[in-house]
Design a protein with these regions (language model features):
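Helix-biased "structured C-terminal domain" signature
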Residues: 1-211
Length: 211
């Protein structure tokens, strides 16, 4: 929402496939193997958590010529894999709405997430994304976005959990430095706890809502 409302000219993100882990490389290969073009941007805020913003464009899809997604992760490479999953699921959901009996009604409700997405998905609306798709801008390498130490296994090895600072502690410190508060609630069910799982819900009141 922050990027869209402020029309932020975000830096572009460059991906070097040779630096990607095996699993992430496969997501990137599949995600770039069609006529769809995914434009990646660095939307990281002062919280320091690597955040990707993507505009996926098509020249042959009249229903979904533009689709937008955003995601974040402590590890920029995991964020990249997530953005491709998010875009794929969004295309399925939006196409279902676009071909539904209430498509025109939903599209007219541009104050809703789905309505706005469908209205701006038509090729004739490509111009509303010019602040992202046009003009020169800085380019950041994927692994350089954010200010957190990415913890991922080295090629052929395993991650050393003791190496480097705890990224979660750094996130909390970044929030405090930005004057933000993290409210965390344990919502683990008895069934989840019995199998060793823990579930929390976190709210940061000072952060911009998703939509």
């Amino acid at each position: 929402a922050l990027t869209w409302l402020q029309r932020l000219r975000l830096p572009a993100v460059a991906v070097d496939p040779s630096t990607l882990g095996e699993e992430v490389a496969e997501y990137h290969r599949v995600g770039t193997s069609t006529e769809l073009e995914t434009h990646l941007f660095d939307a990281t805020t002062d919280y320091g958590v690597p955040t990707l913003y993507a505009v996926q464009t098509s020249q042959v899809d009249p229903e979904l010529a533009q689709v937008v997604a955003a995601t974040c992760d402590i590890d920029p490479q995991r964020a990249l894999a997530k953005i491709y999953r998010e875009l794929a699921s969004l295309r399925i959901a939006l196409r279902s709405h676009a071909r539904g009996p209430r498509a025109q009604e939903i599209k007219g409700q541009d104050l809703t997430v789905v309505g706005g997405a469908l209205a701006d998905a038509e090729l004739s609306m490509r111009h509303v994304f010019d602040f992202l798709l046009e003009g020169e801008r800085p380019v950041h390498a994927l692994d350089e976005i954010g200010t957190l130490p990415a913890s991922r296994p080295a090629a052929g090895g395993s991650a050393d959990s003791a190496a480097g600072p705890d990224p979660l502690e750094q996130v909390v410190a970044n929030l405090e430095r930005a004057g933000a508060e993290a409210i965390v609630v344990d919502i683990t069910t008895d069934e989840a706890r019995q199998v060793g799982m823990h579930v929390i819900k976190a709210l940061i009141p000072e952060a911009m809502p998703l939509s």
